[in-house]
């Protein structure tokens, strides 16, 4: 495909925007290509600046579960903007969306709207610290919870005692309060708690890890975290920014039957507009200002356009058979890609939960960050580029989740599988 216009725009962008993009993964660095600049999208397709169209499995990194430009959402937002785009004051729309979220998500009794997933997770952690009077937190290697300083930490040789900053600009004094365990490893969690008795405010986890590819929780893992937190007086936070309303209407906590103390949300609840939320038990949430002393605020929190898009999106998700249809489509795609690799004799380890999926370029089981890193990232990059040439837009990183939307039909799924057969055979 010809992408001269995208290349020209990328050159221009690098003069004015660091790295030419406003979020690092968009630069396509890990797949050895220049990024596509997108000018429009509809349904399950996106169109770049050179008028090439692609079947989209990124979906703006998860929000577009309905597909792009769903007419009902678009019309609702058009009506809303005619009344004003931002007020900095309470609206009835906030109450409506809050009620819908509370009705859907088992753990949420009260909810605070914010403007991003990062804002939601950092605020939830602050609130957990205020609630418990403790400073340290536990996260999991390979789980991403936004770019707040306390969360840009990974495991190192000394991580059982102190966190190690994962980015320049993160003070060691901030990072030392973030302890890192291994996903799907309860023993690593128990060890950290034993070494930091009565100091852990919260454990934050993606119930389905979606930022090291797609890695489901092992049997008993989430239940074990719930039990540990109950016995140690620790707040359990599920980061459902990605999984919320994606793997089930009530999120991963509905799917797996494990209820955390707090939940963070984003992506889908804004219908494609910037949004985030965090909620949980009333006795925790009531500590949030102005009803309590834990401070959190935001100029655009509860933005009426985002609330409108979220309300309309959640209404559509309640349609009879919505998640069953999404599951059927997603299963067909994942099975087809797996069969394509098998037919070509190419080793992969496929994972999927609902409409989240990943094709790991390894023959090994992937259950955590160390096993995810055994993947052949160069082979994935080659596969990505070949698929892109065939009009298939996958997540431009081995360690990102891909998404299916309700707008994907049998036609797009079959075209994707045919392309995968050809590309695996060419590797």
Curated annotation (Swiss-Prot):
Pathway this chain belongs to: Porphyrin-containing compound metabolism; protoporphyrin-IX biosynthesis; 5-aminolevulinate from L-glutamyl-tRNA(Glu): step 2/2
Cellular compartment(s): Cytoplasm
The protein's enzyme class: isomerase
Name under which the protein is recorded: Glutamate-1-semialdehyde 2,1-aminomutase
Organism per entry: Geobacter sulfurreducens (strain ATCC 51573 / DSM 12127 / PCA)
InterPro entries: 4pyrrol_synth_GluAld_NH2Trfase, Aminotrans_3, Aminotrans_3_PPA_site, PyrdxlP-dep_Trfase, PyrdxlP-dep_Trfase_major, PyrdxlP-dep_Trfase_small
One GO term (biological process): protoporphyrinogen IX biosynthetic process
NCBIfam families attached to this UniProt entry: hemL (TIGR00713), PRK00062.1 (NF000818)
